[in-house]
Design a protein with these regions (language model features):
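Membrane-interface helix/loop caps of multi-pass membrane proteins
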Residues: 1-179
């Protein structure tokens, strides 16, 4: 896929509310909107790449996963390694145990589920979770793992199934969100 400057512009606009929220500006309490925009951009780009490669009969799920791993894992493991000594020095034993659980969850791209089960993102306890920010990466990685498999399956059955299955997933997700 060729470079698209307008997507970088959208990324810049999306990161502003996130930065301002984390900097403590109360008027920007909706920093999560920027994260949502990042999810949409990422979904669009990945879907476009996969469908283009599938249409040209050159898509490889193994190569796709390798590219994702080369792009994400080095920085992720670096962040985990940097957090480890600070957690060991400053966290109490119970919070250090929680940190160990979060290391495992981050490693298997499920930190969003762990943090959701433990506490809210905006809880005061969130200040003692050095890897809390990885929840969004976990969501993105889950998308990278599941969605290509979905596209491959629907590609095999015809393009009409893509629309039908996406519509079904959309309706189910709306139902779950209301539940």
């Amino acid at each position: 896929m060729k470079y698209r400057a307008e997507i970088d512009g959208l990324r810049a606009l999306a990161v502003l509310p996130v930065i301002l929220f984390h900097a403590g500006f109360e008027s920007f309490s909706g920093g999560f909107v920027g994260v949502d925009v990042f999810f949409v951009i990422s979904g669009y780009l990945i879907t476009t790449i996969i469908i283009t490669e599938m249409a040209e009969d050159r898509f490889s799920i193994i190569n796709f996963y390798k590219r994702r791993a080369r792009r994400i894992l080095p920085a992720l493991f670096f962040v985990m390694a940097v957090c480890l000594p600070f957690a060991w020095l400053w966290l109490t034993p119970s919070y250090l145990k929680d940190f160990g659980q979060s290391l495992v969850a981050v490693s298997i791209f499920s930190s969003n589920i762990l943090f959701w089960l433990e506490s809210g993102y905006f809880d005061t306890a969130s200040e003692l979770k050095p890897l809390l920010h990885t929840w969004s990466l976990a969501v993105e990685e889950q998308y990278y793992i599941i969605f290509p498999l979905f596209l491959i399956a629907t590609w095999q059955f015809g393009h009409i199934w893509i629309l039908a299955l996406l519509s079904f997933i959309f309706l189910v997700s709306l139902g779950i969100a209301q539940w």
